[in-house]
């Protein structure tokens, strides 16, 4: 956002103020951006868990501080002796060397454990654990008891809105506002945007990219071609595989891009009413979940693994109208 100056081109992000988990007994657990309000809400379900939340947040932020600088760097190839790869390996070793033996053990353990096991170390209430486990599985083809899902949690704690770490938000005006801001920024930098111009193939000659050829036959020359299509479409359909190393083509063919979730947009004639929550409660201006235990999440994942629709699916609902049109 900063590099492209998207706020200058009209993009405004409205921070999500909270979230909700509805339970099968008619109750709900609210979540708030405000730390103290969140702890008070946790007390309704477990005083012990409310007290543990501070330790949980501290440990999560500790892991975030370690991994965040690494995310913007290109991972090293451990089998390569190229200077860049050796430099990256040395950088990682220095980061690891800064940790104590205990911190290193905790970090390695955290990266490999499930979100279910991780939450068990802090909390006892099923609803509280279910509300926090969502950040370990959403957008993945994994269940809360799958190894590695604790690490996924970090990506949801490293979000940022206007300098507020851990915050998430909506684009005011909907997703189209992001496209408009990107278009405006691109054109301001001298770019030309072509609509309804499907690419037929990437033109390659003499082992070098020349440009792209459109479906209508038009050709655009370029020294560099950047693709936002998926890896298989880019290298197996838009690019003739004969121009690529056979081993690379094999790896692309084996790359898994199976979807793990579906999205349904529903137009309503009015705002939905939740009898147990007041309409102005900020917890409704965020994620709304209906799965109140980790066990139910895992059972939904079991059905997906068997190639069938989940009989009791994990549902994540949002009402963006309550937030973006302000």
Task: Identify the meaning behind each predicted range.
Residues 4-72, 81:
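Dinucleotide-binding Rossmann-like beta1-alpha1 core, especially the glycine-rich loop
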Residues 30, 34, 48, 52, ...:
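Catalytic cores of large soluble enzymes that bind and process phosphate-bearing ligands
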Residues 186-199:
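A conserved beta-strand/loop element that lines the FAD pocket in flavoprotein oxidoreductases
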Residues 61-189:
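Active-site/ligand-binding neighborhood in enzyme catalytic cores
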Residues 170-172, 198-324:
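Mid-domain catalytic core of redox enzymes
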Residues 130-131, 195, 227:
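General beta-strand structural signal in soluble alpha/beta enzymes
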Residues 1:
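Conserved N-terminal glycine-rich FAD pyrophosphate-binding loop of Rossmann-like flavoproteins
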Residues 25-26, 143-147, 203-210:
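A short, glycine/Asx- and small/polar-enriched loop/turn
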């Amino acid at each position: 956002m900063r590099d492209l100056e998207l706020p200058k081109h009209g993009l405004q992000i409205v921070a999500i103020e909270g979230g909700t988990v509805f339970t099968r007994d008619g109750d709900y657990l609210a979540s708030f951006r405000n730390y103290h309000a969140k702890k008070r809400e946790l007390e309704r379900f477990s005083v012990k868990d409310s007290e543990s939340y501070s330790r949980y947040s501290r440990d999560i932020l500790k892991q975030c501080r370690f991994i965040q600088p690494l995310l913007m760097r290109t991972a090293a190839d451990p089998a390569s002796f190229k200077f860049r790869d050796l430099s990256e390996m040395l950088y990682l070793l220095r980061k690891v060397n800064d940790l104590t033996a205990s911190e290193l053990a905790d970090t390695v353990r955290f990266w490999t454990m499930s979100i279910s096991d991780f939450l068990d170390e802090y909390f006892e209430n099923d609803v509280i654990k279910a509300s926090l486990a969502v950040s370990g599985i959403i957008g993945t083809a994994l269940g809360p008891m799958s190894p590695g899902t604790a690490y996924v949690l970090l990506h949801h704690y490293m979000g940022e809105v206007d300098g507020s770490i851990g915050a998430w938000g909506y684009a005011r005006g909907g997703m189209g506002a992001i496209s408009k801001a990107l278009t405006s920024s691109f054109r301001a930098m001298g770019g030309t945007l072509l609509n309804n111009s499907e690419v037929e193939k990437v033109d390659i000659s003499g082992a070098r990219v020349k440009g792209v050829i459109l479906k209508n036959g038009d050709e655009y020359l370029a020294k560099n071609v950047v693709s936002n299509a998926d890896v298989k479409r880019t290298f197996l359909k838009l690019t003739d595989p004969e121009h690529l190393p056979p081993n690379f083509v094999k790896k692309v063919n084996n790359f898994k891009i199976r979807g793990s979730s579906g999205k349904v947009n529903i137009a309503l004639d009015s705002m939905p009413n939740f009898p147990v929550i007041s309409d102005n409660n900020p917890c409704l201006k965020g994620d709304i979940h209906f799965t109140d235990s980790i066990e139910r999440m895992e059972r939904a994942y079991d059905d997906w693994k068997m190639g069938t629709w989940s009989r009791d699916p994990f549902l994540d609902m949002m009402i963006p109208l309550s937030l973006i049109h302000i």
